[in-house]
Amino acid sequence: MNIKVSLLFILPIFLLLLTSKVKAGDIVVYWGQDVGEGKLIDTCNSGLYNIVNIAFLSSFGNFQTPKLNLAGHCEPSSGGCQQLTKSIRHCQSIGIKIMLSIGGGTPTYTLSSVDDARQVADYLWNNFLGGQSSFRPLGDAVLDGIDFDIELGQPHYIALARRLSEHGQQGKKLYLTAAPQCPFPDKLLNGALQTGLFDYVWVQFYNNPECEFMSNSENFKRRWNQWTSIPAKKLYIGLPAAKTAAGNGYIPKQVLMSQVLPFLKGSSKYGGVMLWNRKFDVQCGYSSAIRGAV
């Protein structure tokens, strides 16, 4: 009798824990755009993140020499950022994926043609991924993939994604991720996203009132459901880590945990939460507050 009672008591708890484990999501953060955010190795050692996007390779395309901009952390052109190799390898050794994010909000990148896109892909492969180059801006560390944070330029990103995917067939898994704006479909990345080559997509549900939860929760839900239709493996909600991290779109921690995450977890593609950025997360403790609910 006692055994039966115990089993009846334990089984629901076991099923709850199993469900929680299946639905557990990742936290993704952008690092590299403010020296106030601290070191990359400390970001990884915080235990808060599963993926870190190094931001940004902000100049590329139109057959120009690509340029990395880490906003005061180090000077790439003089080799000052090669010191990050040790940190990158440490992060990877503890299970954290390190991506290079290309693009951002500065008007210094574009893809003028398919050939231009393929050339950029070759540069990324040889300088940050599994290829070889005489001068690698981040040293010999091999990053886990490329993040497309594309807000400007011509829509030749299909060719860029396909060429990177071709390179990725040579050995180590190469992840492709993207951070489109929440209006659906994304005017620059839709074609690339429809190829099915992207592993993770973190949609920026901020700086776009029409699809932000705090502006209109029903529109937010409709947009999320639309985004789940793309052939990506996992879909994430992208949010500012503090009110001051973006013009609008901030969701209070308790609202996210009590109202938003339960809805998102209804999707089989739910992947977790992306935060902009590490500096604001350090200041406001957003990820540490939501970690257990993600």
Curated annotation (Swiss-Prot):
Boundaries of every GH18 domain copy: 25-294
- Report the active site residues: E151 (proton donor)
Please give one Gene Ontology molecular function term for this protein.
endochitinase activity
Q: GO biological process annotations for this chain's record?
A: chitin catabolic process; defense response to fungus; polysaccharide catabolic process
Q: Which Gene3D superfamilies match?
A: Glycosidases
List UniProt keywords, sorted A-Z: Carbohydrate metabolism, Chitin degradation, Disulfide bond, Glycosidase, Hydrolase, Polysaccharide degradation, Signal
Q: Supply the SUPFAM superfamilies for this chain.
A: (Trans)glycosidases
- The signal peptide annotation in the UniProt record is 1-24
Q: What class of enzyme is it?
A: hydrolase
A matching Pfam family:
Glyco_hydro_18
A Gene Ontology cellular component where this protein is annotated is: extracellular region
CDD domains recorded: GH18_hevamine_XipI_class_III
Give EC number(s), comma-separated.
3.2.1.14
Q: What upregulates or represses it?
A: By TMV infection.
Which PROSITE patterns is this protein grouped with?
Answer: GH18_1, GH18_2
Q: Which reaction does it catalyse?
A: Random endo-hydrolysis of N-acetyl-beta-D-glucosaminide (1->4)-beta-linkages in chitin and chitodextrins
Which residue pairs form cystines in this protein?
A: C44-C91, C74-C81, C182-C211
InterPro entries named among the record's database cross-references: Cts1-like (IPR045321), Glyco_hydro18_cat (IPR001223), Glyco_hydro_18_chit_AS (IPR001579), Glycoside_hydrolase_SF (IPR017853), Glycosyl_Hydrlase18_Chitinase (IPR050542)
Record-stated family: Belongs to the glycosyl hydrolase 18 family. Chitinase class II subfamily.
**What is the annotated role of this protein in its UniProt record?**
This protein functions as a defense against chitin containing fungal pathogens.
- Name of the featured protein: Basic endochitinase
| Annotated source species | Nicotiana tabacum
